[in-house]
Amino acid sequence: MILVTTTPSVDGYTITNYQGIVFGEVVSGVNMFKDLGAGLRNMFGGRSQGYEEELMRARNEAIAEMQQRAEAMGAHAVVGVDIDYEVLGADNGMLMVTASGTAVQIARTA
């Protein structure tokens, strides 16, 4: 399993090699029923569970894709991870989530 961290280093480990920048991207459509429910909650207040679940799913998929790409590069970890969100489409019906970081090889510090 590839370790993922937002920090520039991993406690207890030394970075031995920088493999390069790695990304994971997910573009997801939001369905009509979630839109309707979110619109009603926007009018009356409250949280949109449908959107929140879609956001979590997309974020987890982007991180998993980034981990797979890092593993293919021979990395043990991804450091300095950043996650970005963007709403796309003429009707703002698409959500793009991008996870990026630096793929590295690490060794346990003595």
Swiss-Prot record:
Pfam families: YbjQ_1. InterPro entries: UPF0145_dom_sf, UPF0145_YbjQ-like. It comes from the Bacteria. Belongs to the UPF0145 family. HAMAP family: UPF0145 (MF_00338). This is UPF0145 protein BL0562. It comes from Bifidobacterium longum (strain NCC 2705).
